[in-house]
């Protein structure tokens, strides 16, 4: 599968830069990141909380068929500008990774296309490098592909 989501991780830096263009208006791309029902579909996680506003918060989790929690994450929203920007923290629970800071920038390219740029900043280069050893690149690319397919039906 072609990796349409571009991931750049410069040596000796604490950040990952993610970019992806979508065949979606910027309003729909933004909605895909902020509407709990849509988020659940493309992220394949249950949204427990999503308070989309400055000083808001969010929480996701994924369970197996027996009800065991496989993944849980939460964060605080620091800035929320509709169709433009979200600045938030992101922390996975029950992992060695501390909270990271995420800057999500939404850009209109044309009436029907848009781009997201995500800058993720980690506590250290080592934590960033540990994240990159996981199937991170393939996972985010697959999630973005699902986002494109699911949200395209809303046009």
What does each model-identified segment do?
Residues 1-46:
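Hydrophobic ligand-binding cavity/cleft-lining segments
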Residues 17-18, 36-72:
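Short beta-edge strand/loop motif at the mouth of beta-sheet-based domains
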Residues 20, 47-48, 72-79, 90, ...:
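Hydrophobic/aromatic beta-strand elements that line small-molecule binding cavities or substrate pockets
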Residues 26, 52-53, 78-84, 105-115:
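A short, structured loop/turn motif at beta-sheet edges
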Residues 29-30, 39, 58, 77, ...:
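Hydrophobic pocket/interface hotspot
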Residues 59-92:
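Helix-adjacent hinge/juxtasegments
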Residues 91-98, 119-126:
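Short, solvent-exposed aromatic-acidic interface loops
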Residues 123-155:
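A conserved amphipathic terminal alpha-helix motif
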């Amino acid at each position: 599968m072609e990796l349409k989501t571009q991931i750049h991780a410069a040596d000796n830096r604490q950040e990952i830069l993610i970019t992806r263009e979508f065949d979606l208006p910027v309003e729909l791309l933004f909605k895909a990141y902020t509407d709990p029902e849509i988020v659940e579909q493309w992220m394949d996680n249950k949204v427990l909380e999503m308070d989309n506003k400055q000083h808001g918060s969010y929480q996701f989790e994924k369970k197996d068929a027996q009800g065991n929690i496989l993944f849980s994450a939460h964060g605080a929203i620091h800035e929320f500008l509709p169709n433009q920007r979200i600045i938030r923290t992101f922390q996975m629970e029950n992992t060695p990774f501390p909270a990271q800071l995420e800057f999500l920038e939404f850009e209109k390219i044309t009436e029907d296309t848009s781009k997201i740029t995500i800058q993720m900043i980690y506590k250290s280069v080592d934590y960033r490098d540990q994240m990159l050893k996981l199937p991170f690149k393939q996972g985010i690319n697959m999630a973005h592909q699902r986002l494109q397919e699911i949200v395209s039906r809303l046009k």
